[in-house]
Amino acid sequence: MQNPQNLIWIDLEMTGLDPDNDVIIEMATIVTDSQLNVLAEGPVIAVHQSDEVLARMDEWNTRQHGGSGLTQRVRESRISTAEAERLTLEFLEQWVPKGKSPICGNSICQDRRFLYRQMPTLEAYFHYRNLDVSTLKELAARWAPQIMEGFKKGGTHLALDDIRDSIAELRHYREHFIKV
């Protein structure tokens, strides 16, 4: 089922925004075809972290991830960062050859920074290019702000939900902003 035109969408939830001091606590992937039709959802993985690591989260992350149940899932998880990387690669290898898909998502450069430091084999699986939906969001906000009114994100800050939102948002921009 591998197709070099398929797109890999990824989202990470982290303990904060600093890849040198914060860590990945959840990850999910979705593979779409080039027309944004979902082909498969990968594993949704809560990555185990110690209570000591979780205690270093700032107020926003503590409230957000605690309220969504993610912090508890991370505590209960037995999956290490290395195992999460392995499971995700195992899934992706079924759908996209190495080096063919850009890394796809929202503000994806931030996710890529964490992958580079904490999951380098997974980061290297992607093409060097990024498909960042937030680029279109920024352009639409400046060039056609009325388009922004037609799309609302769920905002759960759970990895799989965030990817679904990103794909839906790109579909929205394709229909209302990009003239093809």
From Swiss-Prot:
Protein keywords: Cytoplasm, Exonuclease, Hydrolase, Nuclease
Domain Exonuclease: 7-170
Disulfide cysteine pairs (residue numbers): none
Catalytic residues, chain numbering: 128
Stretches that traverse the bilayer: none
Entry's Gene Ontology cellular component terms: cytoplasm
EC numbers for this chain: 3.1.15.-
Coiled-coil features, chain-numbered ranges: none
SMART domains, A to Z: EXOIII (SM00479)
GO-annotated biological processes: DNA metabolic process
Gene3D superfamilies found in the cross-reference section: Ribonuclease H-like superfamily/Ribonuclease H
Gene Ontology molecular-function annotations: 3'-5'-RNA exonuclease activity; nucleic acid binding
The keyword Isomerase is assigned to this record: no
InterPro entries: Exonuclease_RNaseT/DNA_pol3, Oligoribonuclease, RNaseH-like_sf, RNaseH_sf
Compartment(s): Cytoplasm
Superkingdom field: Bacteria
Protein purpose: 3'-to-5' exoribonuclease specific for small oligoribonucleotides.
PANTHER family in the cross-refs: OLIGORIBONUCLEASE, MITOCHONDRIAL
Similarity field: Belongs to the oligoribonuclease family.
Name listed for the protein in its UniProt record: Oligoribonuclease
Organism of this sequence: Stutzerimonas stutzeri (strain A1501) (Pseudomonas stutzeri)
